[in-house]
């Protein structure tokens, strides 16, 4: 029986693909070498230790229906669209070696006619007249007995959209965690016009088989049929949850301020594990009572726009005469934390 396994996803759902990756990684025999090929529709993928409010323009993402997905490996934030090809190499120890998987990808690119080289710990670059340009970034994860190397190749990604979502909105955040480093990038189509995802997958597959001297049939993974993977439903539910994608952010503080016709408002939030642990409100309003009550209500609240809005509007019962002010406040807060 071959020790190789080749899986190809026909889903563009980042939560589905990352759940498949997680299940395969946890359950594979330590003697197996796995290649998983996939791609995501419009998604910002953040590292395990990153803060989405700090890394991303979450409001713009929501407006444009761009998903957020937290991966289980470290590293920085990246934007995926269908112009990216994603790959994951997995192996048990001591066979796991990220230099091997890197060389397989480089061999695949070379077979396609692209001369690339490794740069630093995570990137593959090509030389252009304007200098080195990144075409691939990677991240890694290791446990006691296994490891994986996953990354992307830029084929024909919409590079103009990187700045739309990976530059945070102008929010006053003081946050802990990993900050993404922006790199100079280029698409492979600049070097190989017309190159497709399927051609790149075929080249990586051939290089994978050539390295190990074996071949196996590809397994197509599809959301149309629930993958036959133990605990997949639970893993997918976690991967797609707000608690994982947003709530796992490192502790941070958020300062919001706005001036309304009825007074200025300054909100100070401390947030841990997606919950507000401390809320302070400062105002020069002539009637500060609703705002003081709001500070108490927000303690322990999920740091989610709809939940904050709900707490604001709940105060209408106790302060009906301040309906206009509370509705303005509610709309502003909901927009500010998206």
From Swiss-Prot:
Keywords: ATP-binding, Cytoplasm, Ligase, Nucleotide-binding. It holds the Pfam family Lip_prot_lig_C. One of its GO terms (molecular function) is lipoyltransferase activity. In the transfer reaction, the free carboxyl group of lipoic acid is attached via an amide linkage to the epsilon-amino group of a specific lysine residue of lipoyl domains of lipoate-dependent enzymes. Residues 29-216 form the BPL/LPL catalytic domain. GO terms for biological process: protein modification process. InterPro entries: aa-tRNA-synth_II/BPL/LPL, BPL_LPL_catalytic, Lipoate_ligase_A, Lipoate_protein_ligase_C, LipoylTrfase_LipoateP_Ligase. Monomer. Pathway: Protein modification; protein lipoylation via exogenous pathway; protein N(6)-(lipoyl)lysine from lipoate: step 1/2; Protein modification; protein lipoylation via exogenous pathway; protein N(6)-(lipoyl)lysine from lipoate: step 2/2. It catalyses: L-lysyl-[lipoyl-carrier protein] + (R)-lipoate + ATP = N(6)-[(R)-lipoyl]-L-lysyl-[lipoyl-carrier protein] + AMP + diphosphate + H(+). ATP binds at residues 71, 76-79, 134. CDD domains: BPL_LplA_LipB. Its main location: cytoplasm. One of its GO terms (cellular component) is cytosol. It is an enzyme of class 6 (ligase). It is found in: Cytoplasm. Catalyzes both the ATP-dependent activation of exogenously supplied lipoate to lipoyl-AMP and the transfer of the activated lipoyl onto the lipoyl domains of lipoate-dependent enzymes. This is Lipoate-protein ligase A.
């Amino acid at each position: 029986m071959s020790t190789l396994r080749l899986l190809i996803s026909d889903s563009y759902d980042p939560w589905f693909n990352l759940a498949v990756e997680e299940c395969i990684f946890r359950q594979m025999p330590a003697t197996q070498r796995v290649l998983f090929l996939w791609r995501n529709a419009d998604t910002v993928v953040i590292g395990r230790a990153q803060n989405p409010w700090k890394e991303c323009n979450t409001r713009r993402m929501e407006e444009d229906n761009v998903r957020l997905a937290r991966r289980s490996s470290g590293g920085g934030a990246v934007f995926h669209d269908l112009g990216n090809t994603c790959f994951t190499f997995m192996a048990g120890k001591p066979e796991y070696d990220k230099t091997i998987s890197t060389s397989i990808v480089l061999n695949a690119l070379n077979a396609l006619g692209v001369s690339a080289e490794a740069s630093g710990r995570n990137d593959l670059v090509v030389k252009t007249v304007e200098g080195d340009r990144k075409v691939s970034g990677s991240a890694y994860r290791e446990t006691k007995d296994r490891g994986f190397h996953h990354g992307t190749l830029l084929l024909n990604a919409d590079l103009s959209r990187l700045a739309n979502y990976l530059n945070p909105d102008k929010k006053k955040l003081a946050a802990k965690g990993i900050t993404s480093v922006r790199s100079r990038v280029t698409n492979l189509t600049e070097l190989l016009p017309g190159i497709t995802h399927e051609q790149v997958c075929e080249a990586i597959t051939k290089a994978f088989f050539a390295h190990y001297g074996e071949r196996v049939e590809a397994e197509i993974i599809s959301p149309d049929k629930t993958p036959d993977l133990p605990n997949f439903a639970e893993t997918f539910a976690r991967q797609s949850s707000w608690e994982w994608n947003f709530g796992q952010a490192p502790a941070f503080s958020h300062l919001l301020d706005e001036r309304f016709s009825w007074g200025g408002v300054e909100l100070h939030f401390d947030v841990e594990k997606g919950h507000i642990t401390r809320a302070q409100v400062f105002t020069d309003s002539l009637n500060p009572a609703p705002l003081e009550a709001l500070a108490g209500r927000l303690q322990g609240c999920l740091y989610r726009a709809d939940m904050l809005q709900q707490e604001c509007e709940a105060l209408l019962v106790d302060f009906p005469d301040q309906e206009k002010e509370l509705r303005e406040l509610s709309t502003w807060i909901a927009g500010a934390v998206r």
